[in-house]
Amino acid sequence: MDERNPRDDVARKVELSWLMAFYGGMLTDKQREVLTLHCEEDLSLGEIAQEAGVSRQGVHDMLSRAAQKLFDMEARLGVADRFSRMQHGLEACRDALRQKRYDEAEQLLNQLIALDQEDDHGL
C-alpha cells in the first residue's frame, strides 16, 4: 500500500513545475511533455501512458529521470534558488521603502547587489 502523503505529492509537483520554468529546455520534448501532463495537468501515470502511447512503467521511469535531471541542474547551478532569493529581497526592500525604513532598505539593497555579484557557479 502506498503510504505517501498527498500534500508531499502536491509539493513535489509544484517544485518540479518551478524547476521546469528554469531548466525545462534541458529536457527532451517527451520528458517535458510527460512532466507537464503529470505536474500541471495532474494526470495519473496510467492516463499519461495512454496519451503518450507508452507503458505506465515507461512513464514512471521517464518522470523519475526528468525529475532527477531537474534536481541535478538546480543543485549544480542554483538558478531557481538565486531567483527566489532575489525576488524575496526585492519585496522586503520595497516594503522597507514604503514604510520609510531607509536604513533597512539600504542594507537590503546592498545584500541584493552582493547576491547579484556572486559567481559561485561560474555564471
Predicted segments with their positions:
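Residues within the DNA-recognition helix of helix-turn-helix
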Residues: 62-65
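Short amphipathic alpha helix immediately N-terminal
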Residues: 29-41
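C-terminal flanking helix
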Residues: 67-74
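Pre-recognition alpha-helix immediately N-terminal to the DNA-recognition helix
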Residues: 18, 32-33, 92
